[in-house]
Amino acid sequence: MSMLSRLLTALEHTEGVEAVTLHANGPQSAPGVAFAEADRVAKNWDLGACLQVYIEAEHAVLLDDVGDGRCLRLEGASGHYGRWRHAVERHRPLIGRMHEEVA
């Protein structure tokens, strides 16, 4: 099992998570568009750069800018932001070493 597979599997075991993907964060990708808009709002409010976007509706999505033009996407049940964020932070050193192909 590759390091990427182990990482995604570990994150999928976080409570409420139904799917995890790692994306190239291009400007036309859905995560890229969400980050661009969130970054625009953050800068307008003098908050600095946007590092994470959490969207909660019937389902929830957490987008995390992991660097190198990549975005980690967790999707699942609403109401688990704290757990998801903790899981991403706990795995951040491994994510930073990840140089495999992304979606």
Regions found by a protein language model. Give the residues of each.
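Acidic, low-complexity cytosolic segments
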Residues: 1-19, 23-103
